């Protein structure tokens, strides 16, 4: 019976209580733990420890495979290592600040040395199995490819391989804690035994093994102890979750301190033992296989020119081949040069070695699009200048690419050496541009790299002197162009001082140098590209120094604008730069219309930044591929050669304002007027559509506000918007002689505001005084007289001048504002009527004008001849009626137009 019934017997209640006790005992035993499971302390490891332990275990496996030369398993373990390192990268970047752990670099260095050792052992390679041999090649390729990202770390490690880092100490700690530190640990520490962890247990008394009673008693005692401990645990852990949480005790911290002390003691013991073994002498021990530097010559060899040339040929024969150590090749060439100089083998041999060193430095960087390293760049400049000084100092050495290798002469003068210093200096110049593009233009690195231009130009000058002494016209044109490209964009203030007479006429300026170089190219060049680039650079340089007429004449005589579309992209970029600078020059000289014509093609596209190769605009997804973007980035100009885009846009908008506003005022009611500048017109219209216009802030807003003021004839407000502190800082102060430019701008604003005022209010005045206009616009009276006379001559203003009274009489031949609006309204209504009539005809057709066309017999169902003849007569009658109706309609239109003209005349008379 169930124990929940109140009227049960005692036996039933006792049995039920026994059942309840049994169930309680079973539940408790389900969560009972042994002594070992309870007392073993749970260790929570960090992500760093887990990742590092995974790496060290794989590294240990790789070392074991290397010992037995199990190459296939080494390959698979290496792949596992790379994957494990990839997983550990977030931890390394967070904990180690992105620095690769030293034990990982040590593993890579040992693996590289192992592969080199096995690979160089040719006899051993022959005895390898097919699987081992295949795995060795695969492993070698993968390791060489993988360690390219760790070159700097590997080089630093090989310089001091015996140093230990904190990461290696942690790895040793992990191995010592886990008890699996091998003999070949990274830090060189001897393996230590695992320290057993303290376990709480009751002291058990020793007893003989063959005593059954004692065994029973011991078992009984252990059972009782477990029961008491389980009851204690149940009292201690009220929640089951607390049983599995890590317990932090002071003993754990003490264990960590003891472990650290043991490691320190082991290190000190090893250090003392090493000092005792060294007997007072220090020796650097390099781990792994050491690749010895090949000997240049035998010990007793007689060093002469043929031997050195043979060695040079041997070194350079490895050029471009796989598995060639390019750094070692450069070092060998320098050593060979020193040996040649020590034995006085001649300047020709030294020049030959110099040229091969330059070629080896160029070959070091396999990717042409990437810049070379700075150490190689400095070395290249030094070697290049040294070679050219040797060539200039020895006139009997002829170095040319036309000299065949079998015709080289090193024994007797004249010496013939095969090589092309022109190609070397051109590549040097290209590498300099790559270095500039790679640097951040706003950093100090860019400035330090830009200082190297002095040495680059000096090297170009040395090559130029050499080819002026012995070189063909084509070679001289090429080296002249290189010098021009370093000179054309630089401003020389001495040119303007010479113009003003502040310097003597015999002073040589950059304009004179450009004239000399460019005129030689014009006369001697056989290729169109060099001549075209020389003309463009010449125009650019003239425009930069305000030689407007010389620059304009060069453009007109060369007809560059007709053939530039067929040129290469670099030449087209130079053409765009030339047109931009020519527009700035025209603006500085007061030729506003010419400045607008020069800049309109650049600015109307909205992409002047790309056209001038000063940056890439963000494109949509499929407008530019990755390859196209890479090519366009290579064409970009260095930052110090950029033209200020805001200055260009401001000059363009101001020029458009000075041209467009008077034109709009003169053709205000002309429905067919054209736009001079579409970009400026759009800016003006967008500003007029705004309901609330605040004070101008940007450069464009200043120009638009000035244009609105000019439309009203308010020249002072217009000038204040164009010439103010903010605009001076952004734009006008960038000009040389900026005060002169600001004065010129103010003068043009006054003149164009006067013209706009006359166009706008000519129908208001019967006559107007010239002195009052001069006073209003602060212009001289002769200047106002000249402006009005020009307007009358060009039939822009219908007026006449009265010189005695100094007045302008308005003829008022043009319609008034009301008349012009009425005429516009008449034209629009007439057009609307014509359109409505056409729409009505299209909807109704000619159905009612064709007589009996609705009869089915007229459509061909009745076939007799009489009906056909009658139908023909009806069609003729209908055609006559249509002609009569059209004549009547035309007459009605004429009458309507006459009535409208009479109404307009009546309005005028009233």
From Swiss-Prot:
Entry GO MF terms: RNA binding; translation initiation factor activity; translation initiation factor binding
Biased composition (Low complexity): 194-207, 862-874, 895-910
Domain of life: Eukaryota
Main location group: cytoplasm
Start and end residues of each PCI domain: 639-815
Positions with biased composition (Acidic residues): 11-20, 162-186, 209-235
Residues recorded with modification Phosphoserine: 34, 165, 176, 185
One Gene Ontology cellular component: cytosol
SUPFAM superfamilies listed in its UniProt record: Winged helix' DNA-binding domain
BP GO annotations: formation of cytoplasmic translation initiation complex; translational initiation
Keyword check for Cell cycle: no
Keywords for the protein's UniProt record, in alphabetical order: Cytoplasm, Initiation factor, Phosphoprotein, Protein biosynthesis
Cross-referenced InterPro entries: EIF3C, EIF3C_N_dom, PCI_dom, WH_DNA-bd_sf
Keyword Cytoplasm carried by entry: yes
Residue ranges, annotated region (Disordered): 1-21, 157-279, 847-910
Subcellular location: Cytoplasm
SMART domains from the UniProt entry: PINT
Protein task: Component of the eukaryotic translation initiation factor 3 (eIF-3) complex, which is involved in protein synthesis of a specialized repertoire of mRNAs and, together with other initiation factors, stimulates binding of mRNA and methionyl-tRNAi to the 40S ribosome. The eIF-3 complex specifically targets and initiates translation of a subset of mRNAs involved in cell proliferation.
Subunit (UniProt): Component of the eukaryotic translation initiation factor 3 (eIF-3) complex. The eIF-3 complex interacts with pix.
Family membership: Belongs to the eIF-3 subunit C family.
Entry protein name: Eukaryotic translation initiation factor 3 subunit C
